[in-house]
Amino acid sequence: MTARNLFLLPGDGIGPEAMGEVRKIIAYMNEAMNAGFVTDEGLVGGCAYDAHGAAISEADMQKALAADAVLFGAVGGPKWDSVPYEVRPEAGLLRLRKDLQLFANLRPAICYPALAAASSLKPELVEGLDILIIRELTGGVYFGEPKEIIDLGNGQKRGIDTQVYDTYEIERIAGVAFEMARTRQNRVCSMEKRNVMKSGVLWNQVVTETHKAKYSDVQLEHMLADAGGMQLVRQPKQFDVIVTDNLFGDMLSDVAAMLTGSLGMLPSASLGAPDGKTGKRKALYEPVHGSAPDIAGKGIANPIAMIASFAMCLRYSFNLVKEADDLEKAIANVLDKGIRTGDIMADGARQVGTVEMGDAILAEFKTLSA
């Protein structure tokens, strides 16, 4: 069978500990399922700066470009707060996104039933919540030009950012949203501000045209982004897939994440365009949480977000849908049994460390996949 090439970038802080639990799952899948994963590993972030003077080396960048998928841990920490801006730890992630041309950011907001009480909303509003927010990652106001602060010469300054979207950028992110919806509940809600922004008018038009041309089997709804934020808090389970631009996606995905009550448990994926010959997309998978340097090396970090990111990798990079389903179910089963790391501890639960949580999830995964 064809090898499945994974490039692991554990990074800083708790990244290596969390990645260690994914390695166990990869080893089991290779042994028991003949999965054919071939792994290589590199440095990114502060540890890469310490070793190479850059947030990611050129050699590791080439390995990332050659891999079928990249698994990324976390970067940063106080140790590197004073390094030059262009080689700060976060620059490694930005370089990966840029060079891999990752334009679609997928952020699931999943509320495991066992953790519904941890949400700031009533449990009945969020229990069983499963939203996928798809954010355009390489266009919009974060990248548009001009972007500057100018001196007006009268004691005043003017800050300028430019919101820019071209048709092709909207078409391709809409295509990802419709394709993902087909594998879920077949519903997409597109969010923009067409009432006050010309880019929002174009966004609405292009999403509508793309839907009509290729995806008319998917249910499409349009919503103003501010109303969408309100509805996410009012009645979140009305949504399946939400697609939006870079700025609104940045905000709405964090709002949706907090509905779950467990920001540190959520995965994400960033996808590129399909290859013209193979149809495969470049992809990077990472937990939403940061490097948590205060608990690094203590063996208490929660590995669930990293494991759930690997489940997304199985689903979107390798089309191993059953295996992805089983791994996500294994996480839910472990939580149902009252097994918790300290960050999600609850009355009556049993507190465990990183390795024990990883072992418990692997044991459930073995049972489900037997």
Swiss-Prot record:
Pfam families reported for this sequence: Iso_dh
Annotated InterPro entries: IsoCit/isopropylmalate_DH_CS (IPR019818), IsoPropMal-DH-like_dom (IPR024084), Isopropylmalate_DH (IPR004429)
Catalytic activity: (2R,3S)-3-isopropylmalate + NAD(+) = 4-methyl-2-oxopentanoate + CO2 + NADH
Cofactor, free-text remark: Binds 1 Mg(2+) or Mn(2+) ion per subunit.
Requisite cofactors: Mg(2+); Mn(2+)
Assembly with partners or alone: Homodimer.
Protein name (Swiss-Prot/TrEMBL): 3-isopropylmalate dehydrogenase
Source species of the chain: Rhizobium johnstonii (strain DSM 114642 / LMG 32736 / 3841) (Rhizobium leguminosarum bv. viciae)
